């Protein structure tokens, strides 16, 4: 049991920490002299995300055996994104470019905690012996990718003062992902379909993450800074 917990932590929280380093290193010291966000605020929201992700996962376990149900998938997609919106939609974050990173922080916290909980819980269920650690790892990584990206999307909405427009965008992506990954848990699902849905959900999470973090982020930072009447010449490409 203790070994399972350690492995689950490495899979879930480890993926979150690695992704955090890869994304943020270009936006903070020493890559730039003036970081694009406050470390205390970021890690405070990351901690809030860990707590929220843990609470959501505890609720998720009550529906074990129905994880494949469409209504459950949609409901939890909404809960995930509402948690991010409620935390970020405070006046102190409105119209500020660093809110993008705080959205990323709470999202990656939620994703990391949920991935850890899922890996540990699933590994302890006798009825799921075929679920390998490799499968847990893939689900953990895509969970972290998805929630960090949708968190940044909601952060963009708060920064642009259009929170509900971007919340809806994040919700659509989250619902699509949950509907795909839920099919992995259909009773007596064929192995071929399990891997097909796993690949599709991974491609969705990875594609959306790449779009938000690598394609859009520099441009969005410039636009929000312009809204604030500011500019920077050190925005990473």
Language-model features: locations:
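Hydrophobic alpha-helical segments at protein termini of multi-pass membrane proteins
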Residues: 1-237
């Amino acid at each position: 049991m203790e070994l399972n917990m350690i492995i689950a932590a490495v899979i879930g929280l480890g993926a979150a920490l690695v992704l955090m380093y890869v994304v943020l290193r270009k936006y903070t010291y020493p890559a730039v002299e003036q970081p694009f966000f406050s470390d205390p605020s970021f890690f405070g929201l990351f901690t809030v995300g860990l707590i929220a992700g843990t609470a959501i996962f505890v609720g998720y376990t009550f529906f074990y055996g129905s994880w494949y149900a469409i209504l459950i998938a949609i409901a939890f997609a909404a809960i995930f994104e509402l948690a991010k919106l409620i935390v970020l939609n405070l006046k102190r974050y409105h119209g500020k470019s660093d809110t993008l990173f705080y959205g990323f922080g709470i999202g990656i916290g939620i994703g990391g905690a949920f991935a850890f909980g899922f890996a540990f819980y699933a590994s302890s269920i006798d009825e799921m012996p075929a679920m390998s650690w490799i499968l847990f790892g893939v689900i953990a990584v895509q969970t972290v990718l998805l929630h960090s990206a949708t968190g940044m999307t909601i952060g963009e909405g708060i920064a642009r003062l259009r929170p509900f427009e971007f919340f809806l965008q994040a919700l659509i992506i989250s619902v699509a992902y949950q509907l795909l990954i839920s099919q992995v848990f259909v009773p007596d699902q064929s192995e071929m379909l399990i891997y097909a849905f796993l690949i599709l959900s991974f491609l969705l999470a990875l594609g959306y993450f790449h779009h938000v973090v690598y394609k859009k982020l520099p441009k969005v930072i410039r636009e929000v800074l312009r809204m604030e009447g500011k500019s920077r010449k050190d925005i990473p490409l």
